[in-house]
Amino acid sequence: GGADCADQWGDVTHDESLSDFVLTPGFVEGHAHMMAGAIWDFAYAGYHDRIDPDGKLWSGKGDLNTVIGDLSDYEKTLPDDQPLVGWGLDPIFLQDERLSRKHLDQISETRPIAVMFSNFHLMCVNSKALEMVGYSNETNAEGVIKDDAGHPTGELQEMAAMFPVMRRLGIDFRSLSQTEPAVRSYAKVCQRAGVTTVTDLFSTLTDEDVTTLTRVTGEAQFPVRIVPALAAIGAAPAEIAQFALKLRSMSTDKLRLGAVKLMTDGSIQGWTARVKWPGYV
């Protein structure tokens, strides 16, 4: 209402200290990952329309034909020696058969191709990528999915199976998350979504990472508060707890440290999570 909207209730005090400001809503995102910005260096293959950090709209892919067609167009823009990496695919939304190497081989049989699923716990690769890492019908490794004839379908589930491909194709979650350009790109994504406080939910947080985050988030114009959760991996529980306490003491206004994330399982929507009957306990 106007300045006199409360006068009907008697004497009031008019506080005009904020009259020249614009109040905008904030939003807290409790499950997100820093690579949501830099991942746009790769080809988007998801179902929903998405806007990249620079404001460009990328249309969703409603069926496998569109996924393959759009990735084929993207492939034509790449140098001959560069792999094709896609991301964002979620088979749950697609009514077609499941993505396999036979689909990706339609794009190229000579260029290695990997498409990360939206949960980043699974990927599908083409025959060239399988060849690069030595996966074949003789491979006996958990996560290397095979068809009824015993041949790899191209689907790889969880890090143990995916990492050999990731290493050779240059898919590095750390560089997608902890470099200065990645942090700034993440902030752009948040800003476009109206997010003012966001986590990075499974962060390595080395000394170098913390130095970069402190410097970049400390800039007056940096638009978001980041609350990273330390990845509880690679050390004894007591050491992780001690490091988390150290991090907490280093918090700043726009970098809140000290949270820890335990990851003990896989992806529910990717069917790699080990949950009890009836499937969600």
Write out the residue ranges for each language-model feature.
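Divalent metal-binding segments
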Residues: 1-243, 258, 262-281
